[in-house]
């Protein structure tokens, strides 16, 4: 196993070649052992984890008694996994989680809107994520299918001044970690992108500043002489990590501004990655929207994420969409950078509305412009997760 990569490797006994790898549900894996169940005869792989955790220390002798500090943490946990060799991916420890997304109407300005339709994307069905059940919260909704994704539509005959209510959805989800098992040799000979994909995923349709000199120059520099799609993506990712440091911003700036500033949020990392990849004719799209707080041992406790989160997927012709994280692997200045979330996602990612807008507003069937009225000026969102059980 590899502590930094948060990964366990399965090797070919005779040659030592990697057959497949899986992500661990916790950070800092440091030891492995198989144990045979005496009753069933089944062998279970256990992983030892050794690291540090933050906690609030109560110091009665201090003027400020509650202090944030670290302590050692060591424990053992079984690792379950499944390798789908035919489709080139491996799944590991899964969890049944309940996620609720609720909007609380609280307009900054008094507005009235007739025939308002408020659309909120619903969780997706993927290799690593299965939707067991979705129920409405606060008021009923109808469902639409947009580009293969489920969308909840909340309808208001008239949104009145001073109106207050909550509405949203609650989902019961099975989520697992996934790691795609592709090498550059596997994608040496791939077909060309279809014209439909070129028109949709190689264009600047999200303020990516792809026509600016600084971004176009970065696109050339980012891949060097690489021609293989995986090596190109990895080179682009490492280039972006070299150029940026992570920092929360109140709003998302365009990639040209982000490059000059050298600091970006997850959304700004994604914007720059999208721009450079698309300029190098690699189809890609934004994916998100939330991460369950990564406390897999806190079952039955409501958990609240501090922020939303986005990452991206790139398309390999002849294979399909493959995930790539935005900033979490940018862990040290100038690298080297781990590969744990290159073609992989941890169990705590929740994929919602892949390739479509997360939320949108319309009145009488006409989309409302963000400059006139936006979701952020109408409501406050509330997101909660509860880990119900571990899936074996």
Predicted regions located by residue number:
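Structural signal for beta-propeller blades
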Residues: 6-8, 53-55
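Short loop/turn segments that connect beta-strands within beta-propeller blades
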Residues: 12-16, 60
């Amino acid at each position: 196993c590899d502590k930094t990569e948060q990964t366990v490797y399965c090797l070919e006994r005779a040659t030592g070649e990697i057959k497949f790898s899986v992500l661990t549900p916790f950070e800092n894996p440091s030891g492995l052992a198989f144990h045979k169940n005496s009753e069933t005869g089944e062998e279970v792989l256990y992983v030892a984890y050794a690291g540090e955790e933050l906690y609030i220390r109560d110091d009665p002798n201090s003027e400020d008694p509650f202090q944030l500090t670290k302590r050692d943490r060591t424990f053992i946990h079984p690792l379950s996994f499944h390798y789908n060799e035919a489709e080139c991916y491996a799944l590991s420890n899964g969890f049944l989680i309940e996620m609720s997304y609720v909007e609380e109407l609280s307009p900054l300005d008094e507005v009235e809107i007739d025939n308002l339709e408020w659309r909120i994307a619903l969780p997706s069905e993927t290799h690593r994520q299965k939707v067991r059940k979705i129920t409405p919260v606060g008021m009923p909704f109808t469902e639409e299918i947009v580009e293969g994704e489920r969308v909840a539509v909340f309808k208001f005959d008239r949104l009145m001044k001073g109106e207050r209510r909550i509405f949203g959805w609650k989902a019961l989800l099975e989520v697992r970690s996934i790691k795609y098992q592709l090498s550059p040799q596997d994608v040496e000979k791939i077909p060309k992108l279809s014209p439909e994909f070129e028109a949709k995923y190689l264009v600047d349709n999200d303020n990516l500043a792809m026509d600016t000199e600084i971004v176009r120059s970065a696109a050339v520099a980012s891949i060097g002489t690489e021609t293989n799609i995986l090596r190109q993506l990895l080179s682009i990712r490492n280039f972006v990590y070299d150029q940026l440091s992570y920092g929360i911003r109140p709003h998302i700036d365009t990639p040209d501004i982000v490059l000059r500033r050298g600091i970006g949020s997850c959304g700004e990392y994604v914007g720059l990655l999208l721009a450079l990849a698309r300029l190098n004719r690699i189809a890609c799209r934004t994916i998100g929207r939330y991460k369950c707080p990564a406390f897999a041992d806190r079952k039955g406790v409501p958990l609240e994420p501090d922020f939303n989160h986005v990452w991206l997927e790139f398309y390999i012709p002849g294979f399909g969409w493959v995930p790539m994280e935005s900033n979490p692997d940018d862990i040290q200045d100038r690298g080297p950078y781990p590969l744990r979330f290159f073609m992989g996602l941890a169990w705590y990612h929740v994929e919602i509305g892949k390739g479509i807008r997360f939320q949108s507003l319309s009145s009488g069937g006409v989309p409302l412009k963000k400059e006139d009225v936006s979701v952020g000026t109408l409501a406050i969102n509330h997101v909660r997760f509860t880990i119900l059980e571990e899936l074996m």
